[in-house]
């Protein structure tokens, strides 16, 4: 795979993490991209996940709301002849409509744009789609979320019976810098555990009130075994 990228930016870090280090698979638990024929990619960025999953034989629907990232996403899908569809929008727990996206300052950071207000950041208006409506429309088997905190409300809104039977794998980076509450994280993974057979993440001290470690993010892998 080859990628159009912006030199001297987080693009190189993303390529290293997703393509080379393969952070969205967890082989010890059998969490593999190929196990889900259709992936919903939330936080498409420049297309590393979309192209990686396509190379594993999967179809991908990739959401990316930030215009420049979306342009790179589209170009990289085309460059790698990936079986992926880019969509210029975000996905949220709330209603379909529009929201402000607070974009990163400077020339380096291209992947920390967020719907949560950040001091000193400019905002752009983006289209957003409701998560449950997106699930109903595309009926994915796998879901990947890396959306800078928006995953928390989405996952917290999902009761065990809300997950469609077609979904057999979910992976996400949980953003403790947006909400450091360990109790909320536990509630979310417990609800996932009531639907999925395996929920894997690094060890957490459940007795603590807040997550105060660096990096302030934890990878989670949830999967069905049958």
How does the language model describe each region?
Residues 1-226:
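Phosphate/nucleotide-binding beta-alpha loop and adjacent structural elements of enzyme active sites
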């Amino acid at each position: 795979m080859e990628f159009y990228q912006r030199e001297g930016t987080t693009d190189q870090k993303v390529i290293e993490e997703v393509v080379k280090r393969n952070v969205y698979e967890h082989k010890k638990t059998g969490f593999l991209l190929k196990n889900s024929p259709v992936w919903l990619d939330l936080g498409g960025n420049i297309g590393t996940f979309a192209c990686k999953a396509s190379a594993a034989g999967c179809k991908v629907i990739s959401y990316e709301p930030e215009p420049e990232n979306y342009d790179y996403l589209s170009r990289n899908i085309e460059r790698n002849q990936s079986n992926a569809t880019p969509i210029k929008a975000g996905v949220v727990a709330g209603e379909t409509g529009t929201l402000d996206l607070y974009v990163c300052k400077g020339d380096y950071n291209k992947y920390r744009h967020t719907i949560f207000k950040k001091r000193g950041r400019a905002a752009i208006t983006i289209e957003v789609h409701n998560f449950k409506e997106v699930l109903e429309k595309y009926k994915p088997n796998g879901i990947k979320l890396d959306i800078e905190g928006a995953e928390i409300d989405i996952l917290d809104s999902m009761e065990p019976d809300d997950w469609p039977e077609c979904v057999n794998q979910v992976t996400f980076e949980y953003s403790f810098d947006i909400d450091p509450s360990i109790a909320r994280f536990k509630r979310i993974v417990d609800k996932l555990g009531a639907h999925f057979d395996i929920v894997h993440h690094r060890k957490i001290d459940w007795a603590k009130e807040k997550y105060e470690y660096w990096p302030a993010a934890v990878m989670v892998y949830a999967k069905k075994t049958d």
